[in-house]
């Protein structure tokens, strides 16, 4: 949950006899130290506080994560080293062509300002940020910088933002999230689903006997071997005719122990399949994880218990998400229904 604000109280001196000279010298030393620290914060980039919430005990929301392209390390995070404690971290995967989706999210279930994000974190234990890579287009990067300046709700990954690199971005996301947040669960979500954070919080907070958990809306299905199809798998010869049990891509979660194991491995030690959800599912097969199947994460319409709503099976998310997100939010069953279903339902 939200970390309590730490208050430090200076102890009053018990000595009653201090010379005037000593008091003056002490005050002068404190003044010089304060001035020196302030100057250091201004001049030394490593000490600079960034983001809009530098007066609170929460970390800057927009930070940059360095990805090791050589693959020889497990990734490095630039900025604060202290991990922020939350119950769950939700990384909304987004791209440079999805500004409209982000606008719709901020108008519906995701707070649009730092104070709203802080209140949501306090009430649910969930920290929510957009996850985005980089592009060679300076125009698109400039647009992103303007959006960051306005909303400050991103984690920037130092990896090229391309559809073909989604498995790499997903691994970068989990490593970045683990470095920044001390969380019980790390949730990967797409920017085209309607989410109820309050219900997601309850799902993640359930008592579990297994510390390594992989939860989502689980599925199996045929392996696509036709290169003309969107979900074509070049490594189909390793998989057989049917995919193993794995979660749908729009939303799933890994427990802290699972993510810690991923973080410990070098980037170039992972098998990358063409599809991100299959890639994660394959890694889970190699680990001693408990698979949890929750259909409340893949409902086509809002219900008294739905956590995530998207247009399954027509689309891998909401069809026309910018419009559909706003339409769903106007429905009382989506935005105004209680967290827990009533006894009558």
Curated annotation (Swiss-Prot):
TM region positions: 24-44
Domain of life: Eukaryota
Glycosylation sites: 267
Pathway membership: Protein modification; protein glycosylation
Annotated GO biological process: protein glycosylation
Pfam families: Galactosyl_T (PF01762)
Stated family: Belongs to the glycosyltransferase 31 family.
UniProt-recorded name of the protein: Probable beta-1,3-galactosyltransferase 14
Gene: B3GALT14
Chief localization: Golgi
Organism for this UniProt entry: Arabidopsis thaliana
Obligatory cofactor(s): Mn(2+)
